[in-house]
Structures are given as C-alpha cells and as structure tokens.
Amino acid sequence: MPNFVHLHVHSEFSLLDGANRIKDLPVRAKELGMDSIAITDHGVMFGVIDFYKACKANGVKPIIGCEVYVAPRTRFDKEPNIDNKYYHLILLAKNNEGYKNLSKLVSLGFVDGYYYKPRIDKEILEKYHEGLICCSACLGGEVAQNLLHDNLEKAEEVALWHKNLFGDDYYLEVQANTLREQIIVNQKLVQLSRKLGIKLVATNDAHYLKKEDSYNHEVLLCIQTGKRMTDEDRMKFETDDFYVKSPEEMSEYFKNIPEAIENTVEIANKCNVDFEFGHTILPNYDVPEEFETHFDYLKKLCDDGIKIKYAENVTKEILDRAEYELSVIKKMGYVDYFLIVWDYINYAKSQGIPVGPGRGSGAGSIVAYAIGITDIDPIKYSLIFERFLNPERISMPDFDVDFCYERRQEVIDYVGRKYGQDHVSQIITFGTMSARMVIRDVGRALDIPYAETDKLAKMIPNELHITIKKALEQNRELSKLYENDPEINKLLEIAIGLEGLPRQASTHACGIVITKEPVDTYVPLYVRDGLISTQFIMTTLEELGLLNALQISGIHIVTPPRTLTSRSSL
C-alpha cells in the first residue's frame, strides 16, 4: 500500500461548505490505511482541538492547519470591486510555535483584514511564518490563478517569494480532480516545480468523506447560498472528486509524479503539534503592596468578611470551614481566581450595578460568601464546598454570576481596562442544524413547497436532543411517509446526512475569557458584528486551562427591580 497523507481537508467547521464531521475523519483515515490527516478549514480554526482529540483517540496523527485567505494588496485595503478578491493559501503548523503563529495570522485576518472574508497579507505572513509549512492551495491560490491566466512570470515571482520565505517548507500543490482547469494547472505546476526546484505535494481538497456524499454536499452549498438544486447559477463543485480518497486512488492519479505523493508523508513527519490539557493558566491579579502574597490578601478579605457577615455569631465551625476552604483554594492554585471574581463583582456593586446572589455549586463556599462573591450563607443552608472545589476535581470551577442585563457590558468593559483589552475576549458558540431546521433547509434546497416541508418538520417531536432517526422510531405517520413516499425518503435521507452540522457562529451570551498573555497567544480570535470572541467554545477553553469561568450573565430578573426603583423615585 502506498503511503499518503491528506493535507487539504475541510471539516464541518468550514461552515455550510465542509461536510466532513470531525469525529469521522480519523476513523476514515485509519480505514484507508493512513496514519495522519490534516484539518484546513476556510479561514478559521474552530475545530482544531476537537480534531486533535479525535485523532489522538483513534491513533491517528493530527496535523493542524488552515486554508487562509490572502488579500491581493494589504489586509487594510477594503475598496469595493478591487479588494473583494482574495487568494487561498494552505498553512500547516510544524510545531507549537507554528500553531501560535497560525493562530495569530487567523486572528489578524478577522481583527484587521475582514472584508467579505478574513484576510491576511504578505506583511504579516513574513512576520509570523516561523514554524509553518506553506502549500500553494487550490485553483484559488495566487500561483494557480496566474498559471490559469497564462501569466507565467507572475506565477514564478509569487512562487519564488514564498520559497524565499519558507525555504524547503514551501510546496506547489497539485490536486486530484478532473476539473479542466485543474488538469491544466497541474501540468503547469509540474513544469514550474522543475524549473524553480520547488517540491510538489498532492492533495484532494476533501470537502466530504466519501464519493457518494457529493450530492449531500451540493445540497449543503445550496443551504449556504440560499439557492435551490434546480437553479442553474447555483454554486457547485463540477465533479464528485472532492472526498477523502484512498492512498491507492491518489497514487494512481499521480502515478507520473510519485514524488508528490511521497512529499505528503515528508510534510506529515515535519508536523508535531501537541496541546496540554488539565492544567490552569490564570492571569495575574495585582494585590496591594502591603501584602507579601496573593494568599495573604485573600485571607485578609475573608477574615474581614466573616466578621462583617457573622458579627457576634462567629463560631468555631465557621472559622474551621473558612480555614479548610482557604487551604484547598491555595493548594489547587485558585487564589487569583477568587480575587479576580471578587474584584469585578466588587466593582459592579460599587457602581450600583445589581448583582445576583450567586447560583450553582459556588454558593457552597464560605470564602465566596465572606468576600462578597455570593450572598448565600452555606452554613445556614448546609451547602457543601466540595461540590464546588475539591482536590479530586479535574475541571476548573466556575461562579455563575448574574448582573443587570442593561449594565452587563460595563462589567466587561471594566475587566478589559484592568487586564488589557487584548487579554479579554468573549466566547464563541455554534448553532447547529437541528432535526426540524435541517428538514426545512433541505426541503427548500430541493424546491419542495414550504407547506409540505413545514408539515413534515412539525412531525418531529419537540424534545431536547431529538434526532430524525429517533423521530422515525417514535412517529408512525412520519415513518410511513419515509417508507412509502420517494420524495420524502430522499429529503429525510439527505437531512439525516446533514443533521447536527454547525450552521452559524455567534457570541456566547454570558461567557468571557481572561488570559495571562494576549488571548491570541492561546487561541485564534473571531469577529462578528464588531465583537471579538475566541474561536474555541467554552468547554474547549476549560480544557486548555483558560479562565473562562467569568459567567457574566445578564438576566432580566435582576433588571426590572432596578427599573421600577428608578421610576418610583421620579
């Protein structure tokens, strides 16, 4: 069996474009005899941690990458009809330095360069190229575009620029599809490779798992673009070649240039990124100068708080409980965590921003009660501290804190001022195609009347985590339609194939992350409607040990009393 590694692969996080589910990619790679596989989503790194974990769980080496967009001029140029064009480029992380640089580039694409797409430019590529492997990408790459338009001198110039920057880590990318343009470009890339001494690498730009998934992928593109399968001008791939092909298929396609296959293994061997899980990276909290340690300051706040909260009713039980909790907090390294949360709650209260009494297991801490993080006495209500924090707990604890919805942003702004705006970010979340939604989406793409698909969608029970397959088991009427009506059978089969894929990204309603170094040192950033958020969801940030425990919820329950109080004073 020939050795080959897929280095240009789009997962479900190339939203409404990639149809490869992350959990399936390493499984399929292993089935086909491959021991490594890459993820290179369009302009984002949403799925890299899930991908990394899935690969590791299946004994497959994960290669972390991204297909970035490159501005034709600079990332700051945003002139209509000129700068809405962009080139594609594949970047793969060789090591953890490369991952950090890739994260920085992807972040800057959103923060500085967003114009239709998140774009980088050659200036920042030069600045953050260390630890990265670069491939010339698909037909949308700058080299390929110039070759396609017979601008050979420019193609050479572009290729040499990248070669000078990346050295032996720059490759010209040939792809295994039957598009007429690709066949032409492949031939010219081979010639360019021999002329300039730049290595070739074979890829397949895999957007779906198997050949038979191509139709579902076409439907997915219709959902993305709002088109119907009957529209002649719809966006589509002209062949069904864009799947995770076997090493044999790839080797057969490139039998005349076997070095392009061999170089995939060369690249895979160069790539070794590792993530650490289960540790905590807390930002530094500055304590007053008169305190030698952060723990001394927390203990002083706690001692003072106990005197205020319990006054003459301080008992040995209370003091012992506080001493025990403080020892656990210190031992587990969460002193700064308590101080950070105390600080922004204290700020909110000082500004007259209504704060909730506290929710969840954090209410079981007498230290939290004493210093004012919560307003619930754990002694009075027999609440257990160990539910919140104990040496056996692996995951990071968190306080659920509710603020007046109308003034929540003031608290976030304060945190940004205190720790630095580049050390604070909101957190991304994803909406997925639920059972009912995907039926309506697929029905629209197939040009089935809305009334019919809506009726079908309403047959799905209104239950949490319901799937179409479960609904078919529960609803006999739906099952009969599925079995007896070819049109509905087709619709539901496609819907099952697409169900659960992420549909859109948005900002988490109440989470923010605070980091020791700038956020994009650890995770890539995303921008939507002017709001900066992480590209990783909250649970992923927790796994990476980042302080995303600032559950700054803005709830209306806290808000109306303040509004009523204001009105009653008029």
Regions found by a protein language model. Give the residues of each.
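Residue-level detector of conserved catalytic or cofactor/ligand-binding positions
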Residues: I552-T563, R567-L570
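Alpha-helical scaffold/interaction cores of sigma-54-like transcription cofactors
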Residues: M1-Q551
